[in-house]
Regions:
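A Zn2+-metalloprotease active-site environment signal
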Residues: 2-262
Length: 262
């Protein structure tokens, strides 16, 4: 068998057993690049959040109301007759909460309206209004339990979370725009951003729970409404505990322990 010259030997090296040498090098470079990209995204998000939260927390009432006015849409639909009594009750509870929190006095009217939805939920909108889903109202929770839900949403308003969530969306949009030229890079950025968002959101939910817990004790002298509401939803929730790791809210068990220990 004739001996291969050096060019044939190099070709055999490329096509033969040792071709994985270059693959290992490329894999190492990819891991380094990926780690650097993840690090940059995390640093950017943390820095952006710290800076934006700093200015939002110190925002004047006038500036806050101007920003909220930018998100005011069309007037909410008329409240159905079947929910009017509950909304009237919630409006009275709202006034008691405002009386006990100077930080929200003179700001949004915190208008309460009804949203047709099949899930038990409530939410604070960027304009400072609050939505209660029809499913939540259909459950006919007692006053103190409704008060906990309302106080939780007003807690978000007091902490200006409704504005901070906008800044998070802006940060995410900036990163996606920069990385948008490459779908693979964009997927990585999206994944890292969502993990950071979920972690940040869970902390905000705990703060809102603590606000609501304190408000119930102030108004009713007890936080039984908070504990009872959480227990009821905990019994309705059939998802395994670990699933809440991927949720924007802490698990019901975590929330109950937080309330019981404070």
């Amino acid at each position: 068998m004739p001996r291969k010259n050096k060019y044939e030997a190099q070709l055999a090296l490329i096509n033969g057993e040792n071709v994985n040498v270059g693959t290992k090098s490329e894999l190492k470079d990819f891991v380094v690049l990926l780690g650097g990209l993840v690090g940059i995204v995390i640093i950017f998000l943390l820095s952006f959040n710290v800076v934006s939260d700093f200015f939002i927390d110190r925002m004047s009432t006038e500036s806050q109301l101007k920003i909220e006015s930018l998100f005011k849409g069309t007037q909410n639909k008329k409240i159905p007759d079947k929910y009017k009594q509950q909304i009237f009750l919630l409006e009275n509870i709202k006034q008691k909460i405002i009386e006990n929190d100077i930080s929200i006095q003179g700001k949004s009217e915190l208008n309460i309206s009804v949203l047709e939805h099949k899930e038990i939920n409530a939410m604070i909108k960027p304009d400072g209004s609050i939505l209660f889903t029809t499913k939540l109202l259909d459950e006919n929770f007692p006053e103190e339990e409704l008060a906990f839900v309302l106080a939780h949403e007003i807690g978000h308003y007091s902490n200006k979370d409704h504005l901070k969530s906008i800044s998070k969306q802006i940060a995410y949009a900036i990163i996606c725009t920069i990385a948008g030229l490459d779908s693979k890079v964009n997927n990585i950025v999206q994944g890292v951003s969502e993990i950071e968002f979920l972690s940040h959101s869970k902390e905000k939910e705990k703060e809102a729970d603590m606000y609501a817990n304190k408000m119930l004790i102030t108004i009713y002298g007890t936080n039984e409404g908070a504990k009872n509401f959480i227990k009821k939803l905990q019994n309705k929730d059939k998802l395994p505990e670990f699933v809440h790791y991927f949720s924007s809210h802490p698990s019901w068990n975590e929330r109950l322990k937080l309330i019981e220990n404070n």
